[in-house]
Amino acid sequence: MKPKITIIIPCYNSEKWIEQCAMSCLNQTYESVEVIAVDNESSDGTVAILNDIKNNNPELIISSAKNIYPNCWDEAREEGFRLMTGDYVITIGSDDYIDLEYVDKCMSVILSSPKNIKAMQTPIQGIRQQGEEFVSTGIIQHSYKSKEQFKKLCLTKCPVNTPSVIYSSELYHRGLLETKPKEYGGAADYDLYCNLIDNDVFIYPFPQWLGFYYRWHPEQPTWNVHKESRM
C-alpha cells in the first residue's frame, strides 16, 4: 500500500469556497488520503457546509481550533497535525482547490526518491474572480538548486508557495514544523522555512505545474498582511 497523505484544510469564514476545496481533496485519485478540516471559529456557514459534506463523505474529519492569531492558520494547522495519521502532510487553504490527480502526481515525484525528498513544493496557478467567472493570473513558481541559493533568496523574498508544500510527517515528529505566530503573525511560515533550511531540510522545488489553484480575493489573509505592512 502506498504511504498515506494527510490534507489539512484550515477554515475561517470560507462558506464561498469550502465545498469546492473539500471535494477536490476528498475526490483525489491517490489511493490513501486523509482529509482533516479544522474550523478556526468561523462566524458564517462554513461549519454547516462541512457537516453537510460529511453526511455524504463520512471519511472527512472535522475539528476546531481557537482563533488566536490574526491572518494566519497556525492554530488550525497545529490541530490538524495533532490528528493526522498520514506519512506525509499538506496544508491547503480553504479558498484554494486542486486537480483530482494532484496528490497522485506529487507523490509519484516524492516516492521516486523518498530518502532525499522530505519536503516538496510545486508551482501554483493563480485565479481571480472577474464578473461571474474566474480567470487565470498566471503561474507562480520558485527556482533554486541548492540550500545556499535558497538562503540567499530568503534575504529578499519568501521563495516558497506555502499551500503547495508536502512534508514528510517525520519532520513534524522531529519538531521541525513548529511555527511562532505570536512572534511573526502571518509571516510565521517564512520563519519556518528558514528554520528548515538551517536544519538541512531542502524544500525541493518541482518545476512543473501539477494542478494547484490559488485563489486571489480581498478577504484572504495574504491581502490583510500586505495592508498592515503598509500602515
For each feature predicted by the language model, list its residue ranges:
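Glycine-rich, basic loop-to-helix element that forms the pyrophosphate-binding segment
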Residues: 65-84
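Acidic helix N-cap motif at the loop->helix transition within catalytic regions
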Residues: 19, 44-53, 97, 101
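Short loop->beta transition adjacent to catalytic acidic/histidine clusters or analogous donor-positioning motifs
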Residues: 2-5, 26-37, 45, 58-61
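Conserved donor NDP-sugar-binding/catalytic core segment of glycosyltransferases
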Residues: 101-136
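A conserved acidic beta->alpha catalytic loop
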Residues: 39-48, 67-69, 93
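Short, well-formed alpha-helical segments that are part of the catalytic scaffolds
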Residues: 14-27
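Short aromatic/hydrophobic "clamp" motif used to bind/position activated sugar donors
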Residues: 89
